[in-house]
A protein has these predicted regions:
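C-terminal "post-core" interaction segments
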Residues: 1-236
Length: 236
């Protein structure tokens, strides 16, 4: 089995196309379809709405992705999937943390509500408001909150964020007394936020320095994927 890892650092208009190319590259390297995918949205501050909708659409066959509701009818919109799933239903785990905001929360919420992915990590930032900037005659601008984002199940993201299905906390270790001759190290791996590049992909189970060995949550996500694949195989 081959499992992919993709990190999205922000959402832009071309993020979906870039992500799809990376997935195709991973499958070419594997020589077969991926058995599962880790989608890393940690410390992703968001970006453009269309980018989040298009990325969600890559993994959903039907249903609502996100909706906006405002004080007036012209602020109400619904964005839906267009009957495609580039992974053909292969299991997914999405990594999030409190640095995951806005567009990241839209993607995580959509995949979670549709049961398409397990969300692993910590509660997200909670930025689910639609803001409009109105220019003023004096050259200044006024920023107004005109609507809010809602997940497919009608959950408001604003101020509440996305609760992960599985909460991952950094492991804390107490120092063992010196006379025992042993000492515990902090084993919680943490991959620093990478600068530049919107999408970075690699095969999670490959490479000389395996990603799951230096990033605790990626390792946990990979274990979850392996478990889900095994359960599906036994059920099938």
């Amino acid at each position: 089995n081959h499992y992919g890892y993709v990190r999205v650092s922000q959402f832009q208009s071309g993020t979906s196309a870039s992500l799809r190319r990376q997935l195709e590259r991973l499958e070419e390297q594997a020589g077969e379809p991926l058995s599962g995918l880790v989608l890393d949205l940690r410390n992703n501050p968001g970006g453009v709405l269309n980018g989040a909708v298009e990325v969600s659409d890559l993994f959903l066959r039907e249903g609502v992705i996100v909706s906006t509701r405002g004080r007036t009818a012209d602020a109400d919109y619904t964005f839906s999937a267009t009957a495609r799933d580039v992974l053909d239903g292969a299991p997914m785990v999405v990594l999030v943390n409190r640095g995951s905001a806005s567009a990241s929360e839209i993607v995580a919420g959509a995949l979670q509500d549709h049961g398409r992915a397990l969300i692993l990590g910590t509660k997200t930032f909670g930025k689910g408001s639609v803001q409009t900037i109105l220019p003023m005659n004096n050259g200044a601008a006024l920023k107004l909150t005109t609507a809010r984002y809602y997940t497919p199940n009608g959950r408001s993201i604003q101020a509440t964020g996305i609760e992960p299905d599985i909460v991952s906390r950094r492991l804390q270790f107490a120092e063992v007394p010196a006379h025992s001759g042993t000492r515990e190290a902090d084993l919680a791996g943490h991959l620093q936020n990478e600068a530049a590049g919107t999408v970075d992909a690699t095969e999670a189970a490959g490479g000389s320095e395996r990603l799951q060995d230096r990033d605790f949550e990626v390792g946990e996500a990979l274990n979850l994927l392996k478990g889900m694949v095994l359960v599906r195989r036994q059920a099938g």
